Amino acid sequence: MVEHFQKRGIPIHGLGMQMHIGVSADNAGIAGGMRQLAATGLPVHISELDILVSDWKKDVDLVYSDELQQKQSDKYQFIAQVYKQSVPPHQRYGITVWGVSDAVTWINPNFGLRDWPLPFDKNYHKKKAYDGFLEGLRR
């Protein structure tokens, strides 16, 4: 699509990835998508990042277990790490997390889910997801 628009003289100044994903989202697909965007030479922005432990499934009994917390942390780390590995520094526009705290997530009220998709809990305390994200940025 980018090439098609550019050939028609339509200016494109950058590309964004909305990433409202679950903990089971395919890592190979995510990495491949980032490489494809980077191959355009345009700035790449992860414009909306939140990672659902429910994987978009309605489960009123879902518990934010240690296992789910770790999976979420691992996915946040992977996203930050693959962004840095796949997108050259001059093309990195940034990563925007779509909210700060689980207290204000748009996911639960809009989709009727029980989830904890953000790096801070409802009391604005850091979660494992925060640590994973930070570790991914450091690598």
Show where each model-derived region lies.
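Active-site-adjacent helix-turn-beta-strand microarchitecture at beta-sheet edges
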Residues: 15
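Acidic, metal-coordinating catalytic cores used for nucleic-acid/nucleotide bond scission
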Residues: 23
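His-enriched metal-coordination microenvironments in redox/metal-binding proteins
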Residues: 19-20
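Aromatic-rich peripheral "rim/lid" segments of glycoside hydrolase catalytic domains that contact
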Residues: 29-45, 49-139
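Distinct, well-ordered alpha-helical segments
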Residues: 1-8, 26-34
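Short helix-capping segments at alpha-helix termini
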Residues: 7-11, 87-90
